[in-house]
Amino acid sequence: VFGLVPIQDKKFPLILFSHGDGGLLNQNTSQVEELVSNGYVVIACNHTYNASITFDKDGRPIPYKQNVSWNEQAQYHKKYYTNLLINYRYQDLAFLLKTIKKDSFNEKSVNPFKNIIDFDNVGAMGHSMGGGTTYIGMLKDNEIKAGVALDGWFFGLLDKDAKTNTKKPFLHIGQEQFLDSNIDGDINDSNDGKRNFDIY
């Protein structure tokens, strides 16, 4: 983007993007491009162990749900598809926000974005589980002022979080009913999932 069109001498609102379960940071490129074309800065990350693949600082791949066998899936869902995983994912967004405010990313690299971002206007957007991550981010972080969930997945929210009004603008774009409420699977495997299914 740098060099194509001179950046105006102004600050732009920031949107943090959270991908879905097993997704990637670039999975919603068309929506991100549209937002950037309309004056937003969008930053995305891969959620380690919950993206289809990420890489550590030495370039080694970190696959999705590392070391979780098919036999362990049900227990994995009970433990991680509740509040814990969504909170880990929110911590990734909080880290992004903290990092983008720094003057430099390391001793050799100046942060070219810090001075063009309006940190008083930060929002979050996510797809599926990223929508739940966005909602938790709005509850926990005063800097996140608004959110959008694209077919949001909210089954991982604890009752207290699911019933809390953020008092912030939040748009959920998705179907009225995610699944048949009588099915077995992720919803019933989650301690809070069955109850929160009825809320959303």
Task: Specify the residue positions occupied by each region the protein language model found.
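The feature captures the conserved acid-bearing segment of alpha/beta-hydrolase catalytic domains
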Residues: 6, 145-200
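Alpha/beta-hydrolase active-site loop
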Residues: 49, 54-119
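Short beta-strand element of the alpha/beta-hydrolase
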Residues: 11-20, 33
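Serine-hydrolase catalytic-loop signature spanning alpha/beta hydrolases and amidase-signature enzymes
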Residues: 22-24, 42
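Primarily recognizes the serine-hydrolase "nucleophile elbow" in alpha/beta-hydrolase
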Residues: 96-164
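The serine-hydrolase catalytic nucleophile loop
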Residues: 25-30, 47
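Domain-level recognition of soluble alpha/beta enzyme cores
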Residues: 1-14
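A fold-wide structural signal in alpha/beta-hydrolase
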Residues: 13-14, 36-48, 146
